[in-house]
């Protein structure tokens, strides 16, 4: 049976030497039809599926398929292209040595997307919140785990579905060397987060108009599953450590388990509950 110590040791096993340290970037974006300002569809003549086949011709490899045997990810040289709800496209970059390399990687990715966009009269938009679409106008991609999230989100906040369909971001990932280094980086990142949000806020538009909120993205995240989202007080203190993070994560409701290749709803269980006993698929339903 899985123990709390196993989870703590997982983080310890991820320590990296300073010489081998790396960074990674996750880059999300919206894609619109320029003519009608509608978001790109999942399938069709000009769609995510068609875009994926275009990228395969550029050297990307097929990745994961959904339960309908539709392609939902690509990979190449340690990087991947995946889908967020609402047909948002995400580059999950490979581990690189510095920001110059991740800049080159991101621009190469955007260059490939722009080539497809120009051929098909599409617009690529890098904003924190969709400035045009209403929530009900955005297509949910047929991805099994997103179905579970879609059903659960309204129970734990009023804006979770907006987060899923109408927000984008850029995320930075950093290696850590030991417990002290992890604490220093994690606490500093959380303390700096409000400043970073203010500096880079770029989403003052919502459903075609300016609504006086400088960052609709942050506004949306403030009421999205508050048990797991937001800046927690314990994340600001230098007494923070791996065990405290594990304690926090164990009490959060779990979204799903993958059992026999299928995503199964576990939203009524915390991670701690699932550690105590792994329920069978039929008992979860």
Annotate each PLM feature.
Residues 129-285:
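Loop-rich catalytic cores of soluble enzymes, especially ATP-dependent carboxylate-amine ligases
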Residues 1-157, 166, 285:
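Terminal catalytic/cofactor-binding subdomain
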